[in-house]
């Protein structure tokens, strides 16, 4: 037996981190914040406004979830707080419920709906408030120590020793103050100081050098140091000390800071005292001095015991505090300005500051992110993400290697594999599978206790934080355990004090609950993970999140056992709340009646568009009359099958070079994958158009479009809007719209007609919504929003129309595919089935990969998966292989694969499945010639994903298009309909070949020589020779920039003189600046009769 038998049963709810934090905010955080700033008094002390934070009320949301998404609204509740205004002069008390703002509500899936889009608040990992000590050694080898006291809010205090053995205090990086002066200013006597130190003689040196002070002198001395140039008084010193350290509104250690300081300095100050006390300061200085005598230890800033996670609830609480502080100022001003008789709580409280603070947080904070909804795994991982960036966090440009690196304390808490590639590597992580966050914000992970070499696994596991764990010897989760729960080996590898060592089973304190405890959900979905290089496992984890949900999902033949929980917790599947029997089932809803006859209706999501334009569609997986139990999956969602995650397809693959078509990781696929819709996915695009009020009149949605034939309007209804169900091609009209034409838009003949016929002939311009490139498909839905219906529209818009077009995308050349082991590639060719290599039984292979992609990348897990998949297909079984299976014996993976292949060979009587001469390889035949390949080939069934990087979204072409205003060069990128940039490397290539004329026209008339490009177009239209290029606009910009720096720069033309000498004549490149036309579109000069006759001659 192995410890993994118990592992999956205690996997926590994977989205609990989001939900629990938001619940805490509603139950405690919000009330705590409102109470903290009550009462508010005016400057005279006459008026007092009290808030009863714990009695706040939430009103029902204006729209439900679906309606909020449909209307682009925010799914939020209104917050009302009872308030009492007391007038001390008159004794009048007024009580009212006041509205303090809208609070977005979390959905049951842990997301928020802001302006109709689902968003996620990412958890932030920051330095925990507390005290941290570090040592530094100077060039002479002398060691100095310093301790930083970090608060949640307020001044930072630094205690430091110097080379002369003096102790100093620094407040907020200002000038140094002698430590004893600071202690005296805080009200401690000499005897208090000496009694509180283990080595008082060390501080006596500071007394001798800096002099002894009374409390009053110390306050004056401190004031002088902190506010030099101002007259120092005792009162001023007390004031500055109070405002910096003893005022709860300005200085706050927080619950966590108090806990950490008490723990580090062995104090027992109550948790509700969140300001600095003299005892804290004295103990901090005592600890600093003790370090000089090698007592105590310095801190590691990257240890997870010193970093804490701020989840949604706390981040929201901070925003509410910001809003309340702004509100407090407004209330004070109103109390002063307004007549005290007419004042009431309602008139004093303006909800705008709080609404603005919350809206700003959800709309533009770095931690509020547009949810990645590509597939259920992407959604789940996004909610479990931990970021070190954001307000109060790190800056990616200044973060060094130490912060990004894997720390031993991450073990079982933050996944060492799953992190982005690129500038954010190491700054953004994901919670490990079993990790949870405790009330202080520290990450905990579970362990079973080990007593005398026996694992106690029948009770609940013990959750430990990183600093608690350091004191125990902890065994990994993949060591062998016998049936009596005793550890088998004589010597066991353990972790102790952040080191990996070995020890005897009797000395072990705890054991991990599961081998996958160390890694994240996405990483734990990779079978045979232990045989893959970490870099490739990272790519595999990240690419599973980019897999597109397919039309016909198929769960993997080789899984790890986590698939079902990942699908369930992502919220994509529908789960039954109660035991009962299915009384009605259709594509849209399922009804389940329990034993007491109570019916519950479950509505399914049909063809909804996700944030990434993929399709969310739920399908019932139960039959009429079927008995279901609570917690059973009754409907599958996108990318799930049978309640399990199904991101890709099991297909037959071969590792074999084929005519160079799988060079550099390219894939060669069979047309079966296209014709049988194996990798077909549905994508839903949203197109929007608004009719606005312009200066020349309002735009109109209409079918009457100028110069458009009836054929182009055949799919529109009477109002000029596309009919639902129509098939549309690129360039088709979705919504007809006309805009009044301005005077400047009129051609000369138009102006003449207007002069003759007056206003009536005033023209309109066709500005209809058309299907863009790559947008062909079926119209799924049309939504019309108007003010009359009560919809909120953008300013200036009279009507907004949204058209949803669904398209099926078959797999094609240029699409990106990948396996779960980081083996990614682009499809280079689609071969007919008959040309694909085939197996001895005639089955053609579906996909051909390059065998050179395996050895150098060291992701051998794909080979194990591929061969076990072949066995699984032939045995008609599915395997769940938990990673790190070496506890079952040496080379367990290899033994298992060989065993199962042999079993499959015996069962099917196909000898080629397992050839003893070359195990794991099979004789393969060339589909074109029917001849066998020279060498046997590795063939098997692997789980391959189609990724969201589809060629349809990337392919792009441009003939003419928009230009940048400043440089007059074509814009870049598909979104701007840009051109292909000819960069400096491309210029070098043309220079190397000496293609001077090609290079010249690329840098001038094809780019930013404005006059030249217009003249060239004219010449091409008239069939004349192309004129010589002029000066590029970007050269003129460069000259202007250099001139703006005060450099006298000019362009000179070289002229040959009659005597054979040359001279330079300055040319004014800007001479035609004022009379040039704005080149928004190419200009044609009209062709004269003479030109026409010449061209026909």
Curated annotation (Swiss-Prot):
Gene3D superfamilies from the UniProt entry: 2.40.50.100, 2.40.50.150, 3.90.1100.10, DNA-directed RNA polymerase, beta subunit, external 1 domain (2.30.150.10), DNA-directed RNA polymerase, subunit 2, domain 6 (2.40.270.10), RNA polymerase alpha subunit dimerisation domain (3.90.1800.10), RNA polymerase Rpb2, domain 2 (3.90.1110.10)
Official protein name in the record: DNA-directed RNA polymerase subunit beta
Cellular component, GO annotation: chloroplast; DNA-directed RNA polymerase complex; mitochondrion
MF term (GO), any: DNA-directed RNA polymerase activity
Alphabetized InterPro entries for the sequence: DNA-dir_RNA_pol_bsu_ext_1_sf, DNA-dir_RNA_pol_bsu_external_1, DNA-dir_RNA_pol_su2, DNA-dir_RNAP_su2_dom, DNA-dir_RNAP_su2_hyb_sf, RNA_pol_bsu_bac, RNA_pol_bsu_CS, RNA_pol_bsu_protrusion
Chemical reaction(s) catalysed: RNA(n) + a ribonucleoside 5'-triphosphate = RNA(n+1) + diphosphate
Primary location: plastid
Superkingdom field: Eukaryota
GO biological process, one term: DNA-templated transcription
Function text: DNA-dependent RNA polymerase catalyzes the transcription of DNA into RNA using the four ribonucleoside triphosphates as substrates.
Annotated localization: Plastid, Chloroplast
Subunit structure: In plastids the minimal PEP RNA polymerase catalytic core is composed of four subunits: alpha, beta, beta', and beta''. When a (nuclear-encoded) sigma factor is associated with the core the holoenzyme is formed, which can initiate transcription.
Enzyme Commission no: 2.7.7.6
Family: Belongs to the RNA polymerase beta chain family.
PANTHER family in the record: DNA-DIRECTED RNA POLYMERASE I SUBUNIT 2
Keywords linked to the UniProt accession: Chloroplast, DNA-directed RNA polymerase, Nucleotidyltransferase, Plastid, Transcription, Transferase
SUPFAM superfamilies (alphabetical): beta and beta-prime subunits of DNA dependent RNA-polymerase
